[in-house]
Every structure is written in C-alpha cells, then in structure tokens.
Design a protein with these regions (language model features):
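Membrane-interface extramembranous regions at the lipid-water interface
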Residues: 2-53, 90-106, 144-165
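Hydrophobic alpha-helical transmembrane segments in multi-pass membrane proteins
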Residues: 45-92, 104-149
C-alpha cells in the first residue's frame, strides 16, 4: 500500500486528518484536539453526531467485552475503561452545546451520571432499581431536551455562533 502522506507515519491518524470527510474530521477533533476544551460553542449537528458515536462505541464495546471475556472482572474493567475514555469528550461537547443554548453547565453532568449508573448496574449484574432509573432517566431527558433546543443565533459570552454544514 502506498503511503498517502509521504514523510509521515502511515499508522498515525493525524497524518490522514486532511483527507477525512468533514463530519469525521470534526468527530476526530472532538476526541483529540478538543478533548478537554470547555470554551466555545457546539452546534446541534455536531453534538448529536458525537452522541450517536458515543452510544455506538459503548454498545460495541459491551458486545465485544461480553463475547470475549469469561470473567465479570475483566468485562467490568473493559467497559469502565471504555466509558472513561469517552466520558471527558462527551462532557466537554455537552458543555459547549449548553454554552450555545445559554443554559447552566450543571445539565451536562446528568447524562454522564445516568450512563455511569447504567453501566455499573449492567456490568455488576445488579437487579434494576426502577426508582433510580426513573429519576436519572427523567433528569437526563430534560438535559438532552435542553441540548436539543436551537442555540442563541448571535455571538455571546462563550464565542461566536457555531457554523453548521
């Protein structure tokens, strides 16, 4: 195979960044360059593309962990490490989305708590606690509802209006 970026490491994703489709490049940037960036704003499309990736990533990780491991400890470790890998970028893009709506950052924490509780309960094999699920689910739904609202169409204290393509 010919190296598409001569002089660069062909196994390094950064060397392929310029050749990626725009939406994949934004997702890659959110995972690497904007990993812990809390400033600025994120548009609706960018936010939902990232969350769709997050759900697919966690589901795939759970399936792989379930089919390849025999012990619950390894399964829990793999799923927890996978969630920790994606938790910070998910939180930061949620914060930037809330900046676009002008809402408090508190609402970005709720989906993370709900996902953590769901993963912990599932991986530890605990029986479902429907009251906790209902409370966390309702709070996460309200949070995602806030993040689904259109942003403020003008520049604000967090930056200029995000560009949606």
């Amino acid at each position: 195979m010919k190296n598409p970026t001569p002089g660069k490491n062909p196994f390094e994703l950064e060397s392929y960044r310029d050749k990626m489709p725009m939406h994949i490049r934004e997702l890659y940037d959110d995972m690497t360059r904007n990993y812990a960036k809390l400033q600025g704003r994120a548009g609706l499309g960018r936010f939902w593309r990232f969350w769709a990736f997050t759900v697919c990533y966690l589901a795939l990780l759970m399936v792989i962990s379930d089919t390849t491991t025999d012990t619950i400890l390894v399964f829990v470790g793999l799923v927890l490490c996978g969630w920790l890998y994606i938790a910070v970028p998910s939180f930061t893009i949620s914060v930037r989305r809330l900046h676009d709506d002008g809402k408090p950052v508190f609402w970005a924490v709720l989906p993370q708590v709900a996902i953590f509780y769901l993963l912990a309960e599932f991986t530890l094999g605990l029986p479902p606690n429907w009251i906790v699920w209902a409370i966390l689910g309702a709070m996460a739904a309200v949070s995602f509802g806030f993040m689904s609202l259109p942003g403020i169409p003008l520049d604000d204290a967090y930056g200029e209006e995000p560009r949606e393509d």
